[in-house]
């Protein structure tokens, strides 16, 4: 039999298949990419066992657990675990601390299905701690540079052309602005942190010692950038991306109207997609009411509403340029100009997309690999 695992680094570097014995409510709060939740107990069973443990102690709780997970229920779960083990002979199982739940499942697989299947020692908690430390160590040991620029300059497009990027918006499934929500939900906070840490781990394993980040706020939609990383972002050097006003308007039209409306259709269907897209856009505009002020918000909202109606009627998106131009001129550009002035001392290079991309590639070559 393969031994139980304590090499968390290799588990994540190799995307080793794992099954999680925790209850669905625990799994939903945070898990690891690609892991399958095949719980020993469902949420209701776990709650009953937990209450029993508090009132009557461990022995009574274990006895109740065996009573709840028995007969056809036990058989169905055993078949699911066995199927996973056979499909992934190189995998592992784990529970919260790598203790009783995973040991019980190991024993049932061995005794009743004839399958020897190893567990991850320390379980979810130990792997989670390892990933938190991975991010912390990168902040302490690696070099970082930020890419900033006015809204619509194509910062994400440039980042995706680099091999040393940490895509905070990608991991958060959010574009980072007031209009940044996607058609699909954002990950749980812990999932966001875990995905980011695994990205760091894999890139460092390839010898990357310098990372490029987009200049973000602490909050990306509903996801919060890890504190140690965000604190570093307040003093990392900054590269400023520039582009013409016309190009920026067209890029925003592409990303936030054409592509996003298509995304809503793909996810929610031809009938519900356009309606949900329109509701999302109007809500995004409503979210910045206080920052826009009443008159300006009313005027831009009406322009957005007319553009959405025309898009739904004919498919044309031309009217969207009106509110985009207004929002840039009257809100985003003044705000970013103020932010740039405050960060001027940290800006080490400014240029268009090609110049910034080549500068960042050359910069990475000058840094020691770690």
From Swiss-Prot:
Chain segments annotated as coiled-coil in the UniProt record: none
E.C. code: 2.9.1.3
Entry's Gene Ontology molecular function annotations: transferase activity, transferring alkyl or aryl (other than methyl) groups; tRNA 2-selenouridine synthase activity
Top EC class for this record: transferase
Residues annotated as domain Rhodanese: 12-136
Residues forming the catalytic site: 95
Keywords assigned by UniProt, alphabetized: Selenium, Transferase
Reactions mediated catalytically: 5-methylaminomethyl-2-thiouridine(34) in tRNA + selenophosphate + (2E)-geranyl diphosphate + H2O + H(+) = 5-methylaminomethyl-2-selenouridine(34) in tRNA + (2E)-thiogeraniol + phosphate + diphosphate; 5-methylaminomethyl-2-thiouridine(34) in tRNA + (2E)-geranyl diphosphate = 5-methylaminomethyl-S-(2E)-geranyl-thiouridine(34) in tRNA + diphosphate; 5-methylaminomethyl-S-(2E)-geranyl-thiouridine(34) in tRNA + selenophosphate + H(+) = 5-methylaminomethyl-2-(Se-phospho)selenouridine(34) in tRNA + (2E)-thiogeraniol; 5-methylaminomethyl-2-(Se-phospho)selenouridine(34) in tRNA + H2O = 5-methylaminomethyl-2-selenouridine(34) in tRNA + phosphate
One GO BP annotation of this record: tRNA wobble uridine modification
PROSITE patterns attached to this UniProt entry: RHODANESE_3
Assembly: Monomer.
Physiological role: Involved in the post-transcriptional modification of the uridine at the wobble position (U34) of tRNA(Lys), tRNA(Glu) and tRNA(Gln). Catalyzes the conversion of 2-thiouridine (S2U-RNA) to 2-selenouridine (Se2U-RNA). Acts in a two-step process involving geranylation of 2-thiouridine (S2U) to S-geranyl-2-thiouridine (geS2U) and subsequent selenation of the latter derivative to 2-selenouridine (Se2U) in the tRNA chain.
Similarity annotation: Belongs to the SelU family.
The name this protein goes by in its record: tRNA 2-selenouridine synthase
Organism in which the protein naturally occurs: Pseudomonas putida (strain ATCC 47054 / DSM 6125 / CFBP 8728 / NCIMB 11950 / KT2440)
């Amino acid at each position: 039999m393969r031994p139980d695992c304590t090499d968390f680094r290799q588990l994540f570097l190799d995307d080793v298949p794992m099954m999680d014995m925790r209850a669905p409510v625990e799994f939903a709060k945070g898990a690891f990419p690609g892991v399958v939740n095949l719980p020993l107990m469902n949420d209701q069973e776990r709650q009953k066992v937990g209450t029993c443990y508090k009132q009557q102690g461990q022995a009574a709780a274990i006895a109740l657990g065996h009573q709840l997970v028995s007969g056809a229920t036990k058989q169905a779960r055993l078949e699911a675990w066995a199927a996973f083990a056979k499909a992934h002979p190189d995998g592992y199982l784990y529970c919260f601390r790598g203790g009783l739940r995973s040991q019980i499942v190991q024993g049932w697989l061995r005794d009743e299905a004839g399958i020897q299947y190893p567990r991850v020692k320390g379980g979810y908690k130990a792997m989670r701690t390892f990933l938190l430390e991975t991010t912390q160590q990168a902040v302490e040991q690696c070099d970082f540079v930020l890419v900033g620029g006015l809204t619509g300059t194509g910062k994400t497009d440039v980042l995706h052309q680099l091999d040393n990027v940490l895509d905070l918006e990608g991991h958060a499934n959010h574009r980072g602005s007031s209009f940044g929500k996607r058609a699909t939900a954002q990950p749980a906070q812990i999932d966001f942190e875990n995905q980011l840490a695994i990205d760091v781990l894999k890139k460092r394993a390839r010898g990357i010692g310098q990372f490029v980040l987009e200049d973000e706020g602490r909050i990306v939609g509903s996801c919060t950038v890890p504190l140690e990383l965000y604190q570093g972002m307040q003093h990392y050097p900054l590269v400023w991306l520039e582009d013409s006003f016309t190009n920026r308007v067209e890029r925003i039209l592409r990303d936030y109207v054409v592509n996003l409306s298509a995304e809503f259709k793909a996810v929610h269907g031809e009938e519900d997609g356009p309606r949900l897209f329109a509701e999302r856009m109007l809500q995004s505009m409503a979210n910045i009411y206080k920052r826009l002020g009443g008159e300006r918000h009313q005027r831009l909202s009406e322009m957005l509403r007319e553009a959405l109606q025309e898009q739904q009627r004919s498919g044309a998106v031309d009217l969207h340029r009106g509110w985009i131009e207004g929002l840039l001129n009257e809100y985003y550009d003044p705000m970013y100009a103020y932010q740039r002035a405050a960060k001027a001392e940290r800006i080490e290079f400014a240029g268009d997309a090609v110049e910034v991309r080549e500068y960042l590639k050359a910069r990475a070559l000058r840094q020691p690999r770690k």
